[in-house]
């Protein structure tokens, strides 16, 4: 499996992944297309590719010393195979290379699988945002400081 920067040829696969994994929270085709095309200069789209098939994607923004992980989504049949870990490690490396000293993200409070994944990767809860999502769900805000070994869980 390879993690690489997304290209315009990946837009349809990313949009499909958004719909499959994020449902009502999925981003529009236009927004994905704009981001992949580089028209959002602080936003980085990554894809995980296996045998020429997109099996996951990640989106992160980088502004000054803060990176925000906006998305990690993995196709159902490729979960628990290290895809999310590989995408996260690439985001952490990208953030560190861009001068970030921390990574923030939000995750639904009822998403136990994601909360467990991020905790295992060194993220800690720093806040909660009530009614953050369109359906009124609360978001848990997580943070990970970047330092030496940031791409390997440290």
Where are the model-predicted features located?
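Extreme N-terminal starter segment of soluble prokaryotic enzymes
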Residues: 1-3
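Short amphipathic helical patch at the helix-1/turn junction of helix-turn-helix
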Residues: 74, 108-109
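Short glycine/proline-centered loop/turn elements that form peptide/ligand docking sites
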Residues: 88, 111-114, 131-136
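Structural motif
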Residues: 98, 116, 120-121
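Conserved catalytic-core motifs of GNAT/GCN5-like acyltransferases
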Residues: 104-106, 119, 124-141
């Amino acid at each position: 499996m390879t993690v690489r920067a997304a290209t315009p040829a990946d837009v349809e696969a990313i949009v499909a992944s958004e719909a499959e994994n994020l449902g009502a929270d999925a981003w529009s085709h236009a927004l994905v297309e704009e981001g992949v095309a580089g028209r959002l200069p602080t936003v980085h789209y990554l894809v995980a590719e296996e045998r020429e098939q997109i099996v996951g994607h990640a989106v992160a923004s980088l502004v000054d010393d803060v990176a925000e992980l906006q998305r990690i989504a993995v196709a159902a049949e490729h979960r628990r195979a290290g895809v999310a870990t590989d995408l996260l490690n690439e985001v952490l490396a990208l953030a560190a290379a861009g001068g970030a000293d921390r990574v923030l993200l939000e995750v639904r409070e009822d998403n136990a699988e994601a909360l467990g994944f991020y905790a295992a990767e060194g993220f800690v809860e720093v806040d909660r945002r009530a009614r953050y999502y369109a359906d009124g769900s609360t978001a848990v805000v997580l943070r990970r400081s970047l330092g030496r070994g940031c791409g390997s869980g440290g």
